Design a protein with these regions (language model features):
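N-terminal, active-site-proximal structural segment of metallo-dependent hydrolase catalytic domains
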Residues: 3-136, 140-151, 155-160, 349
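Beta-strand-turn-beta hairpins that frame and shape the catalytic cleft
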Residues: 48-58, 70, 159, 163-173, ...
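Active-site beta-strand/loop signature of hydrolases that rely on acidic residues for catalysis
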Residues: 56-63, 93-123, 166, 199, ...
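Solvent-exposed loop/turn segments at secondary-structure junctions
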Residues: 65-66, 115-118, 144-148, 171-172, ...
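Surface-exposed cleft-lining segments at the edges of enzyme active sites
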Residues: 80-86, 114-116, 179-188, 214-222
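Short proline/glycine-enriched turn/loop segments at secondary-structure junctions
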Residues: 153-154, 186-188, 301-307, 331-335
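Metal-dependent phosphoesterases centered on the DNase I-like endonuclease/exonuclease/phosphatase
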Residues: 219-320
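Low-complexity, intrinsically disordered Gly/Pro/Thr-rich segments
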Residues: 322-333
Length: 349
């Protein structure tokens, strides 16, 4: 065998091994893909049985798996990081987030990006920590559950996390309602499966329906639209039953008529825009634009807001029988997460 043939043979073997490894990976990801049903019951832990008195306070906060504080950036936003450099970074952020919840008491807390067992957050069970710290009833719905995410370099690896609702109220039932998935195979095998976490609380013969949400981020825009449409269909159906509806979280879309935070970064991620006409008559957004609710993670946060891309993408939707007293963004200056919490105060009418 000539030298040239030996070289070609070695190259062929290497290519065959690479193809085989890719095939094995695709088979593994396909077999282990998280495939939740359209509606699934969610367990509620805790013993609190408090009933609503008509006055309700809800706090929503995307905690960024306690891995996206002021010193972190994120590769999908134009940064370079996949996870914090040290486990202590996550622990410090998580402690700060927990203290924020204790210092701002609410009847219900909608948490997004709460990890349970993920490489990116050093396998810390953040949901368990926050539930134990607050002493509230807890319900968790996974929206990201992958045995292995094989990108970028270094790889994300295992992810288990999702939506966490903490509440003092006695929850009659909780469910995970699946939202449309915009991704196709094989990308879908290790990507997010967005959902609503719905908690039902009895109130004067009807239900207070608490809806925790986190809509699509890194899609072409069609996923956000489809998920928003399904969200509104669900909310209006609940209101037509006579229920009180409070939906809140990270919409990954800016709210109508907010111009305080113009686009200064046109190269990286940008949110969608919610349609000003999407709400039926009597419904309303509850949003506070006096402070930003989110920052772009193209780099660590320097504190210079004029040079930081800011957004208002976190807030609430209220049914007509829920009266808005106030809504306030708690400006923590992105100390522990890339989002600021938002506090809602309402009356059930």
């Amino acid at each position: 065998m000539t030298k040239a043939k030996r070289v070609l043979r070695v190259i062929g073997i290497i290519l065959a091994v690479i193809v085989a490894l890719i095939a094995v990976l695709l088979i593994f990801l396909t077999v282990t893909e998280y495939k939740p049903g359209p509606v699934e019951e969610v367990a509620v832990t805790g013993t609190s049985g408090k009933l609503p008195d008509g006055h309700v306070r809800v706090l929503t906060c995307n905690i960024g798996y306690a891995g996206l504080g002021k010193n972190q950036d994120f590769f999908m936003d134009g940064g370079s990081m996949v996870r914090p450099a040290e486990k202590t970074d996550v622990e410090t952020n998580l402690q700060g987030i927990g203290n924020t919840l204790l210092e701002n008491p609410a009847d219900a807390v909608f948490v997004q990006e709460a990890d349970v067992d993920s490489h990116r957050s050093y396998n810390i069970d953040e949901a368990e920590y926050l539930a134990g710290l607050t002493g509230k009833n807890a319900a968790l719905a996974y929206n990201f559950k992958a045995a292995f995410v094989p990108y970028p370099i270094p790889m994300i690896g295992k992810v288990e996390g999702g939506l966490l609702t903490l509440t003092d109220y006695g929850v009659e039932s909780a469910s995970r309602v699946a939202l449309p998935v915009p991704f196709k195979w094989p990308v879908s095998t290790c990507n997010l499966k967005r959902c609503l976490l719905v908690c039902r609380v009895p109130y004067e013969g009807r239900e207070l329906v608490l809806v925790n949400l986190h809509l699509e981020a890194y899609d072409d825009g069609e996923g956000k639209i489809a998920q928003t449409n399904m969200l509104m269909d669900f909310l209006t159906e609940e209101y037509e039953k006579g229920n009180y509806v409070i939906a809140g979280g990270d919409f990954n879309q800016t709210f109508p008529d907010i111009a305080q935070y113009p686009a200064i970064d046109t190269e990286n991620w940008a949110p969608g825009v919610l349609d000003a006409d999407m709400l039926p008559e009597g419904w309303q957004f509850a949003v506070d634009a006096s402070s930003p609710t989110c920052r772009l993670l193209s780099g660590p946060y320097t504190g210079d807001r004029e040079q930081t891309q800011l957004y208002v993408i976190d807030g609430f939707i209220l049914s007509p029988n829920v009266f808005l007293n106030s809504v306030q963004t708690l400006d923590l200056d992105f100390e522990y997460a890339d989002h600021n919490p938002v506090m809602l105060d309402v009356e059930l009418q």
